[in-house]
């Protein structure tokens, strides 16, 4: 019977003894000896080759066989021969990667490990950033598995690697040594500059130094994170410095000329120039982030949310923030940013409007109306609706519960210092199909995998604490981030696909709601089991820019049922034309997200913008249904010929009438040109269903 072995690239190949004989003969020649047929026969008699064995396993047997026969020098030569071939293969792999990368259609398509649409152009800087990624993955896995062995034993460590290699779980951001994302407090910078995190800047003293210093600080902080950097105090701090220069009532005198230069600028013009300086600077590619811009997020607050978060906040001079001027500044920035996006493609900041809900509506009527007005003007931002000021976003959709709102001069503005240290994701579609195939209750198997994931995250946390003890995490030491307020996140992917496999209809039905609650409830139960006073867990519906595509590809290759080329990151099928806008809000309502403590954002895709009244009604729908995190996604049209940007979803440029147009839309949580997406994500974007205006709720 023919025997097939597994090569290093995973391909099956017919086993031939001649290749082994040739390799052994070369090893003998390398030490000045000659292998006779009798010698070869003696060595080969130790080998046990069976179908499905890997090349590495057979070569390991050869090493042992040579030593068993007493040929120690030959065994050493054989080991060196293997090592040399390994190095040659790795070098060739890097050369092949380089060639493929430079020929790829864009940077996201060329990236082998973590395709990212935030990298707009591939060049030598992005290539330099890509080459070491495989090494970082190996290093991160070694660090983590060694810690798992120390804490839980080799068996659990091996099981983790097995689940990882078989794609039941996915470790996010393995190409980076840094922790994931953070919503930082800027108070340490306000009182000490950047010296505590390795910079040399003193604290900001005026509006000009605030803007320049803020840019530098965000770049520095982002270089020490693998994900997003949220600055929820940004506009509040800017407002403080504007007041110091132009008075607490500056917003009432916005048209007053205060610049004595030839430009004769008004207060409003100076403020808009500050907006421009900060936003355009932070949208520039950064060398410290492989030539991509920082992932920068900010928050706006209604009056009640602001009071709840910052009621006890005081600036270093003892002054409290003033709501009336901040209210004006928030609205001014939002309107400016909306208009500026018709002049240039500006991805960041990712904005979140934080609103408190009460009795089925937005409590602050002024901000409910203003939010609807900005959506109607074509602005694209997230809205977070909550019954209390319990959470902040530190990423495109990641929600972090606030455990303590108290203010401290030492640590900064209380609960806004939060985030996620690490994300580990379960592939629910594969896990559930595997369980069904093997006659295991899928609930029990999911619980088993999730239990292991919590242990792995605790091992990661110990490694992080060790880095902090060695002085390698200045953001924690300086108080920008509080390690006790950061979460270990369990990500979820393939939930909709798993439900489809089980024959469930992906609509708001009791059966589907029970399935979602049951699975997410298992994860939340484990959170409570493993939580301590020092460690917190949450669960996030993964954005899955990369892994949604990877899971579908890997599962299909291994014979699992895969209904689409990219796994959903919503509770509904994104290409389903039968669902109206209200259905989508309901499917992201409280009964579906109840156990999803780390957040899930509804991207409500619409063909065209709604009226202010319709958006206002949808805010009420969100409050009633308990849909707490959402945005409206209407592709903006960008002309490739004249550069004109239009907020509408058009087939030709309204300015020069060219049909050579591109679209600006959200790949996951952040907005980019569709042409910057990876090929797989471009296909996914083309299949999204954008609801027609008449299917929106009437008022």
Provide a role label for each language-model segment:
Residues 88, 94-484, 505, 509-663:
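Conserved catalytic cores of very large enzyme subunits
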Residues 483-491, 681-682:
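Core of folded catalytic or high-affinity ligand/protein-binding domains
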Residues 236, 488-501, 521, 666:
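Contiguous, well-ordered alpha-helical segments that form the cores/surfaces of helical PPI scaffolds
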Residues 655-699:
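Long, charge-rich boundary regions
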Residues 3, 45-49, 311, 497-504, ...:
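Short, hydrophobic beta-strand segments
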Residues 269-272, 500-501, 686-691:
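Metallocofactor- and cofactor-centric catalytic cores in central/energy metabolism, strongly enriched
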Residues 1-107, 482, 686-690:
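Charged, amphipathic alpha-helical regulatory modules used
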